């Protein structure tokens, strides 16, 4: 498999880098999203109890100690208590947008890899075919299948590699956006 991969030529280097980056981004984001999604079933009950008791400081402290996007939204809302309801809602919405942006960090890299890797693979296809025809022209009238095979190998290997990397990145991206 390594020998076949090496026949893809220099185009395989960016494809390898994109695949490593896509795998890293997928697992890093998957881990971050899972961590953010962990819910403490008693969190809201304790917040409500603190608020009903008038202990706003304890409610805010609980939010600050609970490292989740949900807790940060609640904390922002609590910090705006006593202000007009629209101010509270806008503050929570802004915090929600910030939290979503944090969770979606590096998603564009996966989307770009999903779209770009096949294009890079097709670039390898074109360069491989150019090489095959160049070799055939250099051989003159004595060209045989071995003269063409190096370029054709490069063309096919880079096409497959680009498609594989792109497809994996696309599925990884789509999986993450549905979590």
Walk through the language-model features, giving the residues of each.
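Hydrophobic membrane-targeting segments
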Residues: 1-42, 176
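Residue-level micro-sites within transmembrane alpha helices that shape
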Residues: 18-21, 27-28, 117-120, 127, ...
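Predominantly long cytosolic amphipathic alpha-helical stalk/bundle segments
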Residues: 37-123, 127-141, 171-179
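Loop-to-transmembrane-helix entry motif
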Residues: 7-12, 99, 103-117, 151-162
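Alpha-helical transmembrane segments of integral membrane proteins
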Residues: 12-25, 111-118, 165-169
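Residue-level signature of catalytic and energy-coupling elements of molecular machines
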Residues: 9, 23, 59, 74, ...
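Channel- or pocket-lining gating/hinge segments that regulate access to a cavity or pore
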Residues: 144-179
